[in-house]
């Protein structure tokens, strides 16, 4: 999932200007259907609503793309018109290069972001994913995502010392294997 050469998924890019012409009707219909099925919807790659990276179809890898502006608040407003009481969680993991405007859009919508425990543990005591560094209670904490190793595999690879340390950070005192 993570590569020095960037990512080239081969997926088509949304034609945001065309979607805006009809008030993001496709997105509204999709979110309305999800709202009928689920109490909570997670929007993956939320940062792309603000700014996204476009890789040319003929490029060998993801290094030769360019940044484009996403629809931002116009899209989130359109979604909010149709979801009713359904809650939205946004995947806002920024890595080493946060996209300006993402936190601002989250604040406008009130939609919580996420933290990933597997990203928390290491030598950096200021790591934003460490539970004692959470500065906002409007968030959801996951052990990992589809981009991570399974939690079983993650813990299996830890030494007893590392496991005890990790569990102490989340207030679990007795490791079991």
List where the protein language model places each region.
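Short acidic catalytic loops
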Residues: 34-48
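Gly/Ser/Thr/Ala-enriched C-terminal appendages of enzymes
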Residues: 147, 159-162, 167-169
